[in-house]
Design a protein with these regions (language model features):
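A general structural motif
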Residues: 9, 39-41, 201-204, 229-231
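Conserved P-loop NTPase "ATPase switch" module shared by AAA+ and STAND
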Residues: 202-214
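Conserved RecA-like helicase ATPase core segment
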Residues: 218-247
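Catalytic P-loop NTPase motifs of RecA-like helicase/translocase cores
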Residues: 20, 214-215, 242
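Structural recognition of the conserved hydrophobic beta-strand(s) that form the central parallel beta-sheet
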Residues: 44-46, 72, 207, 231-236
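Active-site cores of enzymes that catalyze phosphoryl transfer or operate on phosphate-rich substrates
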Residues: 9-11, 158-161, 165, 246-247
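P-loop NTPase Walker
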Residues: 2-93
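Basic/charged alpha-beta structural segments of nucleotide/phosphate-handling enzymes
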Residues: 50-51, 59-200, 216
C-alpha cells in the first residue's frame, strides 16, 4: 500500500495473471466495502466495452443482487457522469465518419503541398490508417511540438517527408475542429481538467479492473482521482511468468 501525501487516501495494486482469482478478489472486496460503508460512493472502472458484463457480474455476486452504491463505468461513461454533474456541455463529438470526411477534405485542399500522400489518399484504408495514427497521438498525449522535434531529427528523407505530410494534415485537422468539435480521444483530457470539481467523486473509492496498462491520458485522470478519492485499487492482469499474484 502506498500512502499519498498527508491524507488517508491509499493506492493499492492488485496484480495477477489471467484466471488467478484477482478479479474475484476485487469483486468480493468491493462488495464488502460498499456494504460496510453504505453512505459512501464506489466506482468500478473497467474498459468501456466491458461495463455491461461487469454490471451483470456485480448483480449476480452481490448478496442483495443489485449495484446500490457502486457505479460501474468505463472512462468515457465516467467522463459524461462528471460533465452531467457539473452541467458542462462539451462541444459536439466528431464521429468516426466525420473524421474521415474532414481528413479527406484537408488532403484535397492541400494536395499540392503534400510530398508523399497526394497519390495515396484515394487508396482503400489509407484514411483509416491516418485516423489510427491521430488517435494514438492523442491517447498517448503526444503534442505537435513533440512530433515536430521527432520529424526534425529524422535522417532518412523518405520517412521525413511522410512525417511532414502527417504534420501538415494533423495541424489543419486540429485547426478545423478546435472551435467546433471534440473527438473521442480528447474527452479524457477534458475530464482530467474538470474532475477535481466533482463533489460526487470526492472521497469516493475507486476500483479498476480489466486493464493490462494505461495510456498517458488515462494515467493523467488516475492522478486526479488519487488527489480527490478516498482509496484507489487497481487490478492489473500481467503475464504469469513475471508476477506472482498479490492480494
Amino acid at each position: 500500500m502506498i500512502e499519498n501525501g498527508g491524507n488517508d487516501m491509499a493506492l493499492q495494486f492488485i496484480l495477477g495473471s489471467a484466471r488467478s482469482g484477482k478479479t474475484d478478489f476485487i469483486y468480493d472486496q468491493m462488495i464488502k466495502d460498499s456494504m460496510e460503508h453504505e453512505d459512501e460512493e464506489f466506482f468500478f472502472i473497467v474498459p468501456d466495452q466491458s461495463t455491461l458484463n461487469a454490471q451483470k457480474q456485480l448483480v449476480t455476486r452481490h448478496p442483495r443482487h443489485g449495484t446500490f452504491n457502486i457505479d460501474v463505468v468505463g472512462f468515457f461513461r465516467l467522463t459524461y457522469r462528471v460533465f452531467e454533474e457539473l452541467s458542462y456541455i462539451p462541444k459536439d463529438l466528431l464521429e468516426d465518419e466525420g473524421k474521415s470526411m474532414v481528413i479527406r477534405k484537408i488532403m484535397e485542399q492541400h494536395k499540392e503541398e503534400l510530398k508523399v500522400f497526394a497519390s495515396s489518399m484515394k487508396k482503400q484504408g489509407f484514411i483509416d490508417e491516418l485516423k489510427s495514427f491521430f488517435a494514438e497521438v492523442y491517447q498517448y498525449d503526444v503534442s505537435m511540438e513533440d512530433l515536430k522535434k521527432i520529424t526534425d531529427g529524422m535522417k532518412e528523407e523518405g520517412l521525413r517527408s511522410k512525417m511532414e505530410d502527417i504534420l501538415l494534415v494533423m495541424e489543419n485537422f486540429e485547426d478545423y475542429i478546435k472551435e467546433r468539435y471534440l473527438i473521442s480521444e480528447q474527452l479524457l483530457d477534458v475530464l482530467a481538467q474538470k474532475v477535481e470539481r466533482s463533489e460526487k467523486l470526492k472521497n469516493a473509492t475507486f476500483y479498476l479492473d480489466g486493464f493490462t496498462g494505461f495510456t498517458p491520458i488515462q494515467r493523467k485522470v488516475l492522478e486526479k482521482l488519487l488527489k480527490i478519492g478516498k482509496n484507489v485499487y487497481v487490478g492489473l492482469t500481467l503475464d504469469g511468468r513475471y508476477v506472482r499474484s498479490q492480494y
